[in-house]
């Protein structure tokens, strides 16, 4: 959230860097949000931006049912048009999200979010724009 705006301006918009998002849900609220993001993501949709920018509104709940209800209400309030229950229940999407998470652990030893992988290697420095920019400039 704090790194992305500068990264986008200085690297992505100039075609120097490409972002590839992978799901790594750490709890049921994030798992459901990942399924919604994958279900409604046509590559042009702003669903991931909506989910990330409103994370504090939906990423809560003492029970799985409460977490699901919070996410559903958030999406309605944001005007996101989708079949919520169908997306949440979609087994293929569920498998896709879980496989992203499994690959993150096995291939890159991911244990937290956010984690940055650059050219197949985990970025191990403190995640701030100064460190990331310096690292990327060495690669370009």
Label each residue range with its predicted role.
Residues 1-76:
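Structural alpha/beta surface segment adjacent to cysteine/selenocysteine redox centers
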Residues 1-4, 8, 73-140:
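C-terminal cap of thioredoxin/glutaredoxin-like
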């Amino acid at each position: 959230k704090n790194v992305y705006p500068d990264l986008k301006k200085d690297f992505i918009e100039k075609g120097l860097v490409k972002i590839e998002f992978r799901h790594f849900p750490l709890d049921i609220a994030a798992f459901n949000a990942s399924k919604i993001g994958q279900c409604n993501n046509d590559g042009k949709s702003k669903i991931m931006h909506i989910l990330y920018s409103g994370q504090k509104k939906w990423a809560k709940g003492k029970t799985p049912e409460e977490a699901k209800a919070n996410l559903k209400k958030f999406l309605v309030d944001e005007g996101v048009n989708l079949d919520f229950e169908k997306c949440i229940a979609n087994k293929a999407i569920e498998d896709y999200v879980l496989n992203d998470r499994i690959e993150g652990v096995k291939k890159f030893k991911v244990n937290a979010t956010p984690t940055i992988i650059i050219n197949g290697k985990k970025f191990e420095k403190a995640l701030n724009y100064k460190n990331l920019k310096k690292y990327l400039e060495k690669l370009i």
